[in-house]
């Protein structure tokens, strides 16, 4: 989009917040870059350039605007709707792959050489993987500087910088100030720094409209005991992260989500934040979805009633795949009970000072040691879970932020006991494919019949072609028409 100068300039003239995250505005006369909705007077057209990412702007020597804080914008929805290698790379970088495995590890996951990957990213997003990871480190550092009392040395290493000097230089170049000045400026803007060790409070930005009742209701109704709960108006869950465990509390509002993270290790902050955004589908483009689905007369009323539906997703793709298999042909409550047994038997214990969470969801390595006695499911279902876990453990099946959606579908369908419903639900909620469509889902077919749409799988699939590439969101809208606990927020009964 940044290549369309006229459209971008109209967006900054109208200060249209819908475009925040799609591109940044580099101002040649001041050397700063802004988000499209920056409240200052728009610069003359001759004095601006439009760049695809904050990393591209920083790479060309521009500093972040202190007024609009463009590095804190919602992420670009472009990377969530595309399945090409650049989009997959961007999702993996957001998950912290470069900091954990280096550029070589990122390239290997994608099946490209380092040089090929550098060339692709530079051409499309204006920055290579190292520059993109550096911009993320800067954002992590800024959050820790502004919302905690951590010493700056601890901030530097938690954010992924290799030295204090590199940290100070990056802050000065990106923000035109020192860490001390950033913390001082933040004191008037933010709540006082959290007193609890390992705790950080964030405000996750959201593109409006945001129909949070659907996504939070779904997460609440399917909560796994010991791993997830609803308490004091917040959805809470445990996190299994690269450097340790975490607990997150997420409280919705119309234009943001309040996120309280308790982490064993602050090096996990960037990854935890990215996974929370992914869980709630916060980087979706609701305007584009509403425009496309609302064009169908059969869906117009449903979409208009609650525009801005998000897909209830996951913090761990492999976890969701296991839970999807456990949910085959059973009630929502039974699926949660089965998963709760696994959590209690194989999950890592956590200490929850503010609630009743007890364990993380087990890792694939832990599930590889599974005792069938912990699963009160048919033997055929046990075989499916064992085959799924074995494939994930030996890496013949890869389910992560950067996997190829179509290839993953094919690999899932090759497993015994995995049919189209399971594969599509995993693609939709586990992998984030915006065009997944579980046509055989009973709830989806009941909702379709209620609206006068075809209720048979094949006929409904044919009809759904008009909703592409947003069939996952059409599914979510249809589900919301049913009387079911997944559509209740706050839940009518305690979830713990």
Curated annotation (Swiss-Prot):
Any GO BP: methylation
Q: Where does Zn(2+) bind?
A: 34, 38, 65, 68
- Could you tell me what reaction this enzyme catalyses? (2'-deoxyribonucleoside 5'-methylphosphotriester)-DNA + L-cysteinyl-[protein] = 2'-deoxyribonucleotide-DNA + S-methyl-L-cysteinyl-[protein] + H(+); Hydrolysis of alkylated DNA, releasing 3-methyladenine, 3-methylguanine, 7-methylguanine and 7-methyladenine
Which residues does the entry assign to the active site, renumbered to this chain?
A: 34, 441
- Domain HTH araC/xylS-type span(s) in chain numbering: 87-185
Keyword annotations of the record: Activator, DNA damage, DNA repair, DNA-binding, Hydrolase, Metal-binding, Methyltransferase, Multifunctional enzyme, Transcription, Transcription regulation, Transferase, Zinc
| Feature: DNA-binding region | 104-125
The cofactors required by this protein are:
Zn(2+)
Membrane spanning stretches: none
For this chain, one GO molecular function annotation is:
DNA-7-methylguanine glycosylase activity
Q: How is the cofactor bound?
A: Binds 1 zinc ion per subunit.
Q: Which CDD domains match?
A: ENDO3c
Query: What are the annotated GO cellular component locations?
Result: cytoplasm; peptidoglycan-based cell wall; plasma membrane; protein-DNA complex
**Where is the region DNA-3-methyladenine glycosylase?**
202-354
> Does the UniProt entry include the keyword Transcription?
yes
**Annotated positions binding DNA:** 30, 41, 63
Q: Return the annotated site residues (Determinant for substrate specificity and/or DNA glycosylase activity).
A: 421
Task performed by this protein? Is involved in the adaptive response to alkylation damage in DNA caused by alkylating agents. Repairs the Sp diastereomer of DNA methylphosphotriester lesions by a direct and irreversible transfer of the methyl group to one of its own cysteine residues. Also catalyzes the hydrolysis of the deoxyribose N-glycosidic bond to excise 3-methyladenine, 3-methylguanine, 7-methylguanine, O2-methylthymine, and O2-methylcytosine from the damaged DNA polymer formed by alkylation lesions. The methylation of Alka by methylphosphotriesters in DNA leads to its activation as a transcriptional regulator that activates the transcription of its own gene and other alkylation resistance genes.
Also noted in the record is: This enzyme catalyzes only one turnover and therefore is not strictly catalytic. According to one definition, an enzyme is a biocatalyst that acts repeatedly and over many reaction cycles.
Q: Which family does it belong to?
A: In the C-terminal section; belongs to the alkylbase DNA glycosidase AlkA family.
Q: Can you state the subunit structure given in the record? A: Co-immunoprecipitates with DarG in the presence and absence of darT.
The entry's protein name is Probable bifunctional transcriptional activator/DNA repair enzyme AlkA
| Organism name | Mycobacterium tuberculosis (strain ATCC 25618 / H37Rv)
Q: Please spell out the taxonomic lineage of the organism that makes this protein.
A: Bacteria, Bacillati, Actinomycetota, Actinomycetes, Mycobacteriales
